[in-house]
């Protein structure tokens, strides 16, 4: 009799453990949204440019931007995302999204530049990036 009750109790505890393990407060079936963003450089004229960036999907918690940097001065392949992210982390300025800034100083006409931005998740890890290369337009000394 005692053995039978012990087996029934053990079976009951086992079932409870299975139910508890399969139920959690996290909804694992919910689709995970990968953060994405864009960056656009426009209105390139007269030694100025307009840089804009916004979050397209997902959620981020801060960003860093390099507004413009001469492509000729970059010593790595900026098409490799890991290298570009590291470069922006080390040299970028903290910003918030959406981001808009009109560059009115420092551009040299005819120079190819890169603009890049990265965004961070809640843990402070870079989760998305965007960049654009472009050529400054204007007149020397303006």
Question: Model-found features: residue ranges?
Answer:
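Sec-dependent bacterial lipoprotein signal peptides
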Residues: 1-21
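Bacterial Sec-dependent N-terminal signal peptides
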Residues: 17-47, 133-141
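Beta-strand secondary-structure signal
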Residues: 38, 50-52, 114-116
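Conserved aromatic anchor
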Residues: 47-60
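Recognizes extended acidic, P/S/T-rich segments that occur
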Residues: 65-108
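Beta-strand-rich modules
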Residues: 104-127
């Amino acid at each position: 009799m005692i053995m039978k009750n012990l087996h029934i109790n053990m079976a009951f505890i086992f079932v409870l453990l299975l139910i508890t393990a399969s139920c959690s407060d996290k909804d694992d079936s919910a689709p995970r949204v990968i953060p994405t963003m864009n960056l656009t450089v426009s209105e390139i004229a007269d030694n100025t440019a307009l840089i804009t960036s916004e979050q397209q999907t997902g959620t981020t918690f801060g960003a860093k931007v390099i507004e413009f940097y001469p492509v000729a001065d970059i010593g790595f392949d900026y098409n490799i995302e890991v290298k570009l992210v590291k470069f922006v982390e080390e040299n970028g300025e903290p910003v918030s999204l959406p981001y808009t800034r009109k560059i009115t100083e420092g551009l040299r006409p005819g120079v190819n530049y890169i603009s890049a931005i990265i965004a961070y998740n809640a843990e402070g890890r870079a989760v998305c990036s965007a960049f654009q290369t472009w050529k400054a337009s204007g007149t020397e000394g303006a």
